[in-house]
A protein has these predicted regions:
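Short, conserved active-site loop motifs that form the nucleotide-linked donor/cofactor pocket
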Residues: 7, 43, 94
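Short beta-strand element of Class I
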Residues: 15-18
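C-terminal lobe and adjacent flexible extensions of AdoMet/dcAdoMet transferase-like proteins
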Residues: 132-134
Length: 134
């Protein structure tokens, strides 16, 4: 789930964007924001679990950018990154941005075949920038 500013940034320079949100109320808010920002035609909203969504996207193209903002401290970042390591929805040019709690350890990403490009810390969270490959 991205906030409105992040959604606009994701779509602005892309032909399409896919949003995944399990919570129906949050989906309503996202849909309203996409309509308000006149980006509804450029975005697809999947109201489902992230793993179900990832499986449904297989074979439908490669993403330029994947932005993850999962609930903190549930290790969903790792679960998604483990899935993506063999997924057809990304390649070596796909940028993966993960938002996480400041205390989340990403020491395992190289073992999964990712290269950490950058890390940016804020007051309460951080963004980790990754790509596939060493």
């Amino acid at each position: 789930l991205c906030d409105r500013r992040q959604r606009q940034m994701c779509i602005r320079d892309r032909a399409r964007a896919v949003f995944v949100e399990k919570n129906p109320k949050a989906c309503t808010c996202i849909r309203e924001n996409l309509t308000f920002t006149k980006l509804a035609d450029s975005g697809t909203l999947l109201n489902m679990d992230v793993m179900q969504a990832l499986r449904s996207l297989e074979g439908k193209g490669v993403f330029d950018c994947i932005f993850m903002d999962p609930p903190y401290n549930h290790e969903l970042e790792r679960q998604v990154l483990e899935y993506l390591q063999d997924s057809s929805i990304l390649d070596e040019n796909t940028l993966i941005i993960v938002e996480a709690d400041l205390t989340t350890d990403f020491g395992y990403v190289e073992d999964l075949g990712y290269r950490q490009l950058r890390s940016k810390e804020y007051k309460t969270n951080k963004h980790i920038f990754l790509c596939r490959g060493k």
